[in-house]
């Protein structure tokens, strides 16, 4: 509210917080008879909000849950986290339903991999020939490929002291205004 934002990029799991913020804005505006605080709306870049599942086979991915991959994690760390992801004993019958931990891995695969890769591993699962080690290795590679531009941009920003000073100065001026 303090920034009087009209659009806020939040995930599906944070929408209830945004609704609470809208209620606060409405209440303040009604009590004081002004339109001071806009009611912020969820912003999602034209896509439905996606809940990224955790690597431990349950719930969402999150730092507090200890089951997340940071966008700036080092290569070795990402590989280690993915290889430790929870799996099951594998499908016993063709076209069997996936367990929750496996669905989670396939959801992440769908987010970072090519459709051909997803189709390949889906077919492997359906015909009971999937090797989870191969799936995890491919998933780690695809996560690394997906996060590389983010890491490069982060490194550019973090190493540009002049830019960082400018951002801090502008931010401080806007906060005081």
Where are these regions (language model features)?
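Conserved alpha/beta enzyme-core scaffolds, especially Rossmann-like or related mixed alpha/beta domains
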Residues: 1-14, 158
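Conserved nucleotide- and phosphate/pyrophosphate-binding catalytic cores
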Residues: 16, 22-177
């Amino acid at each position: 509210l303090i920034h009087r934002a009209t659009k806020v990029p939040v995930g599906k799991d944070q929408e209830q917080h945004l609704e609470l913020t809208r209620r606060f804005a409405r209440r303040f505006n009604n009590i004081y008879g002004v339109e001071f605080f806009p009611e912020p709306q969820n912003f999602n870049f034209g896509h439905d909000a996606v809940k990224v599942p955790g690597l431990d086979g349950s719930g969402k991915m999150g730092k507090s849950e200890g089951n997340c991959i940071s966008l700036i994690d080092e290569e070795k760390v990402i590989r280690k986290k993915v290889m430790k992801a929870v799996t099951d004993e594998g499908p016993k019958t063709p076209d069997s339903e996936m367990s929750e931990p496996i669905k989670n891995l396939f959801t992440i695969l769908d987010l970072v991999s090519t459709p051909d890769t997803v189709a390949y591993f889906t077919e492997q699962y359906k015909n009971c020939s999937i090797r989870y080690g191969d799936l995890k290795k491919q998933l780690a590679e695809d996560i690394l490929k997906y996060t590389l531009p983010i890491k490069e941009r982060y490194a550019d920003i973090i190493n540009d002291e002049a830019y960082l000073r400018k951002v801090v100065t502008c931010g401080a001026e806007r906060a005081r205004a």
